[in-house]
Amino acid sequence: MSEAIIAKKAEQVELIAEKMKAAASIVVVDSRGLTVEQDTNLRRSLRESDVEFKVIKNSILTRAAEKAGLEDLKELFVGPSAVAFSNEDVIAPAKVISDFAKDAEALEIKGGSVDGKFTSVEEINALAKLPNKEGMLSMLLSVLQAPVRNVAYAVKAVAEKDEEVA
C-alpha cells in the first residue's frame, strides 16, 4: 500500500476512535439485506434522534476500538458492520434500531457499548424499552411533585373543614 493510503486509514482509525471515546452509547449492527428504502428510513430515524450511523470496515473498527480502550467490541466486528454513535442520549440508538429491527428482519443487532462498557444484544433490547430522556425526566418530576400535591390537598381539606366549622 502506498503511504498516502496508510496515512488516510490511520486518520480514519483516529477519527473513529475519538467518536468511540466520546460516545455515550454505541450499537453495532449487521444491516446486510436491508432494501435501499429501509436503509434510508433507518438513517433518517437515527439522524432525527441525533445518532450518527456509519458503515465502516472491520479492520478500521478493530484498530479504533483498541485505540479507544474498547477491546470487548472487537468480537462484534465480524461480517458486515454498521455502527451507530450517540454522544448525548444513551437510549436513542438502541431504541431506534430495536424498533426498526421489529419491522426489518434483515437488521441484526450484534451488540454495543454503553458508557465504555460492553453491552450484549439482550441489554440493548432492554435499554430500548426504557423511556427516552424527556420521558424519564417527566416521570421524575411527577414523583417529586406527588408529595407537594398531597400536602396541598391536605391543606385545602383542613381549610375547607375550618370553613364548615365556622
From Swiss-Prot:
GO molecular function, one term: large ribosomal subunit rRNA binding
Pfam families: Ribosomal_L10
Record's keyword terms, sorted: Ribonucleoprotein, Ribosomal protein, RNA-binding, rRNA-binding
Disulfide topology: none
Role: Forms part of the ribosomal stalk, playing a central role in the interaction of the ribosome with GTP-bound translation factors.
Highest taxon of the lineage: Bacteria
One GO BP annotation of this record: translation
Protein name as it appears in the record: Large ribosomal subunit protein uL10
Assembly, per entry: Part of the ribosomal stalk of the 50S ribosomal subunit. The N-terminus interacts with L11 and the large rRNA to form the base of the stalk. The C-terminus forms an elongated spine to which L12 dimers bind in a sequential fashion forming a multimeric L10(L12)X complex.
Keyword Ribosomal protein on entry: yes
Recorded GO CC terms: large ribosomal subunit
